[in-house]
From Swiss-Prot:
The organism of origin for this protein: Mesoplasma florum (strain ATCC 33453 / NBRC 100688 / NCTC 11704 / L1) (Acholeplasma florum)
Name of this protein: Deoxyribose-phosphate aldolase 1
This protein's pathway: Carbohydrate degradation; 2-deoxy-D-ribose 1-phosphate degradation; D-glyceraldehyde 3-phosphate and acetaldehyde from 2-deoxy-alpha-D-ribose 1-phosphate: step 2/2
SMART domains documented for this protein: DeoC
Compartments where located: Cytoplasm
Gene3D superfamilies hit by this protein: Aldolase class I (3.20.20.70)
Keyword vocabulary terms for this entry: Cytoplasm, Lyase, Schiff base
Gene Ontology terms: cellular component: cytoplasm
Length: 220
């Protein structure tokens, strides 16, 4: 199985340095990963480093809590795309979902998608904080909002992707959206199992180790 184009090569830790971001991009070019996934401060630098390659740039929005206003998320998206982002990973308004304020959750996603235009938008759901029913509802709303992906986790909460959650998400979105598994994908075997469960993309800081058949224990 050729995994490279499944991988969003990720570096989101708050103490990431310019040298580490350069290494991330160099590795993404070498292994021809789908995208690098970074915070917005680094987007324009990644654009410069990745110019002329097939590697995209995923920018996180409302990260990692998802609890900022809709207007803030939309502004973040506009700035990210202006700086060179090709894909957006937005964090769901988790509190609003738990309060069953589904209208706000939907409008939040729609506003991000509107700001993103033709760019791919993934909704990060933070499944470890959600019930099975909440995961299913969030997937349904993401499809209604026209988002291209649903995503399991930020990698910054209690736990990351599970095979069971990926299967559940895929069963809800079917062919209407894709699924991204993130957090805890550390080995080639993990990656294979996630893909078999229904994942179309993998968010991991260990893309190089995974491709080489090693285990990654680096922070996200």
């Amino acid at each position: 199985m050729k995994l490279n184009k499944y991988i969003d090569h990720t570096l989101l830790k708050q103490d990431a340095t310019k040298a580490e971001i350069k290494q991330l991009c160099d590795e993404a070019i070498e292994f021809d990963f789908a995208t690098v996934c970074v915070n917005s401060y680094w987007t324009s630098y990644c654009k410069e480093l990745l110019k002329g390659t097939n590697v995209g740039i995923t920018n996180v929005v409302g990260f990692p809590l998802g609890a900022c206003t809709t207007a803030t998320k939309a502004f973040e998206v506009s700035e990210a795309i202006k700086d060179g982002a090709t894909e957006i990973d937005m964090v769901l308004n988790i509190g609003a979902l738990k309060d069953k304020n589904y209208e706000l959750v939907l409008e939040d996603m729609k506003a991000v998608k509107k700001a993103a235009g033709s760019h791919v938008v993934k909704c990060i759901m933070e499944n470890c904080l959600l019930t099975k029913e909440e995961i299913m509802k969030a997937c349904e709303i993401a499809v209604e909002a026209g988002l291209e992906f649903v995503k399991t986790s930020t990698g910054f909460s209690k736990s990351g992707a599970t095979f069971e959650d990926v299967k559940l998400m895929k069963s809800v979105v079917k062919d209407n959206a894709l699924v991204k598994a993130a957090g805890g994908v550390r080995t080639f075997e993990d990656a294979q199992k996630m893909i078999e469960a229904g994942a179309d993309r993998l968010g991991t800081s260990g893309g190089v180790a995974i491709i080489k058949g090693e285990e990654n224990n680096a922070s996200y």
